[in-house]
A protein has these predicted regions:
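N-terminal targeting leaders that direct proteins to extracytoplasmic destinations
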Residues: 1-75
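Short, histidine-centered active-site or binding-site loop motifs used for metal coordination
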Residues: 82-84, 120-124
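Periplasmic OmpA-like peptidoglycan-binding domain that tethers envelope proteins to the cell wall
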Residues: 122-200
């Protein structure tokens, strides 16, 4: 079961886009179509963004986080262990969670340059209702953190997938810890696509 950020405001007077809020996670990943020329420019831009900014904040050696590309290298994916954001069985963010969320705030400052997807996962421990609840409430907590910073969350979308998308088999403590995670997808927005088509991207 997944849940999106449907119907949330952002405290800044901006209206959400109902059509976007209704998209599934899979649909949102491809919500801005790209021709090959535009896609090539965006891949180049995202590669630079990953190397010069994202990897410096979320390198493999930092808190178990990981950075990779997604969807033909057009989307950046940041993975943060849930244990670095939440205490066990808790849906309240840890006091130091801001250290790992702060680097994402820059991607919400220019509306629709990026569509930022926050996707919460857990392992197969507990009942189905528990797994759904904890991922829904944790994804909401992350969304609300960004909203509470006074950021424009018009293009921020949250999803909860319980234990539906494990990275590894849930057959050891280590594997279950890997499956409990927050994924943040930095998806090119319409503004980025328009800039690429007009030759206005800065590398």
């Amino acid at each position: 079961m997944s849940v999106s950020a449907q119907g949330r405001g952002n405290g800044t007077g901006n209206m959400r886009h109902e059509a976007l809020d209704e998209l599934s996670f899979t649909e949102m990943i491809s919500s801005v179509p790209l021709d090959e020329k535009t896609a090539a420019l965006i891949r180049k831009f995202q590669d630079k963004e990953a190397r010069e900014r994202v990897l410096k904040s979320y390198g493999l050696s930092r808190n178990g986080c990981n950075v990779e590309t997604f969807r033909n290298k057009e989307v950046l994916l940041i993975t943060i262990p849930a244990s670095k954001l939440f205490y066990p069985n808790s849906t309240e963010l840890r006091p130091d969670a801001a250290n790992l969320l702060n680097p994402v705030t820059r991607y919400l400052k220019e509306p629709d340059m990026y569509r930022v997807l926050i996707v919460m996962h857990t392992d197969n421990t507990g009942s189905e209702a528990y797994r759904e609840r904890i991922t829904e409430e944790r994804s909401t907590a992350v969304f609300d953190w960004f909203e509470g910073k006074g950021l424009d969350t018009e293009y921020l979308f949250s999803y909860a997938y319980a234990d539906e998308m494990p990275l590894k088999e849930n057959n050891s403590m280590s594997n279950r810890d890997t499956n409990r995670r927050l994924e943040i997808y930095l998806v090119p927005g319409q503004k980025m696509v328009d800039q690429a088509k007009k030759g206005r991207m800065v590398f």
